[in-house]
Structure formats: structure tokens, C-alpha cells
């Protein structure tokens, strides 16, 4: 059952943004950065084709979400190479081919640029955009959805709609960086910081779900740094 394409072995990758930064000190959203990033992706796909011919097993390139690994890998890079700006200065690695979470870019440009890399990630991929509450601007949200339909294999919208069980506040919870560098969630209305009393929904590992104490500090840093694309 493993042979002739009935099963797939995934070659997962992450940190395409950091790799391009390390090599040419540019984001892969620039012309030169994009060209290098596509060369890297094509090389990964070429290896998958080579292994497929050699083994008769189906190999494919997979855009890895890298949830727990994002913190572990970032710390390992800091340990082995010291801190390099825009490469390992943060406690997380950018997922797969994604535009870095800190980069200011509009939704349509982000989705368009990432669509090229989705085509080279046949083992699985997902793009996302960060959006504010769109309840009062549904037409704009529909335009984004239409664009995704026409340009992307798989993409989703992340919004922020949290609830404080202590005071009943309904909106976006704050993420506060403490003196020791760790992050905690806080209700902007009453100051509640007990995560068990805050219903916070964010995308982690490709799915929208309630944030709990199980989310590592690296991923929390990623969430903290995410910018809106609309």
C-alpha cells in the first residue's frame, strides 16, 4: 500500500523567509528574494521527484505549520549561531513559505505572493491573512474571499473575537510582554490575566481554537507580532 502513489511521504519545510534573509538580507517578497525562494522550492521538489523515481514511493513538499518546533528551532539557531537580525532574533521561525508575520503588506498582495509557493507545496499548505472585526464591512470581506477563490489553493482569514469571563468584555484581549520576556494575556477592561477565565481564539497549527497554557512562548511571540493585512 506504500507504493505507486497510494501513500505520500512529506518533506516538510519552514523558515523560507529566514533562509532568504540569511543569504541575501532581503524578504522573499522582494524581486530578488522571491527569485531565490523559488529556486529553493524548486530544488526541494526536484529532490522529491528524484526520490520518487529511486524508491517508487510518493514524496511531496509540505508547508509545515511548525507549532512546537518553532520555539525549539529558534532557540537552537540562537544557540548555534548567536543572534542574527531578521533571521533568529525572535523566538519563533516563520511557518513554511509565509510572509513574515511582522511585515507590513496588504491582504491581496500577501495572498498573491504566497500563491506561487502554494503551487510548489503539493503535500499541503495554507495561507492566512489577519483581519479586524469585519461585521460592519462584509462587502470588503467578500472581495477577499473572491480573491482567494481565484488565486489560492487554500487560505483563511484570522479575526480576533475574545471574551473575558470575569467582566464580560467582548473584543480583543491584550498580549503583554513581561520583564522576563514572557507573554501573558490580559483583559483590557478589567485586567484579568488568568488564561482559564479568558476565552481567546487564535489560529494555531492551521486551525482556529481556544488559546490555553499549552501554547509555547515562541508561538505566543508570533501571535503578538502579527500585523493586520486589511
Go through each PLM region and give its residues.
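Long, C-terminal-biased catalytic regions of enzyme "large/alpha" subunits
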Residues: 1-230
Amino acid at each position: 500500500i506504500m507504493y505507486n502513489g497510494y501513500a505520500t511521504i512529506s518533506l516538510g519545510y519552514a523558515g523560507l523567509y529566514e533562509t532568504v534573509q540569511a543569504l541575501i538580507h532581503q524578504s522573499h517578497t522582494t524581486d530578488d528574494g522571491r527569485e531565490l525562494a523559488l529556486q529553493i522550492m524548486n530544488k526541494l521538489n526536484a529532490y522529491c521527484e528524484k526520490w520518487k523515481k529511486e524508491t517508487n514511493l510518493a514524496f511531496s513538499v509540505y508547508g509545515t505549520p511548525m507549532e512546537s518546533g518553532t520555539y525549539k528551532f529558534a532557540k537552537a539557531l540562537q544557540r548555534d549561531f548567536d543572534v542574527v537580525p531578521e533571521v533568529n532574533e525572535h523566538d519563533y521561525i516563520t511557518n513554511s513559505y509565509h510572509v513574515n508575520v511582522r511585515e507590513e503588506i496588504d491582504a491581496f498582495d500577501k495572498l498573491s505572493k504566497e500563491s506561487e509557493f502554494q503551487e510548489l507545496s503539493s503535500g499541503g499548505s495554507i495561507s492566512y491573512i489577519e483581519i479586524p472585526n469585519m461585521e460592519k464591512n462584509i462587502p470588503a470581506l467578500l472581495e477577499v474571499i473572491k480573491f482567494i477563490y481565484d488565486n489560492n489553493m487554500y487560505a483563511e482569514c484570522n479575526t480576533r473575537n475574545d471574551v473575558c469571563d470575569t467582566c464580560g468584555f467582548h473584543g480583543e484581549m491584550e498580549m503583554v510582554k513581561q520583564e522576563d520576556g514572557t507573554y501573558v494575556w490580559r483583559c483590557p477592561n478589567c485586567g484579568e490575566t488568568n488564561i482559564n477565565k479568558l476565552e481567546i481564539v487564535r489560529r494555531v497549527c492551521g486551525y482556529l481554537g481556544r488559546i490555553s497554557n499549552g501554547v509555547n512562548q515562541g508561538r505566543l511571540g508570533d501571535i503578538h507580532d502579527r500585523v493586520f493585512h486589511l
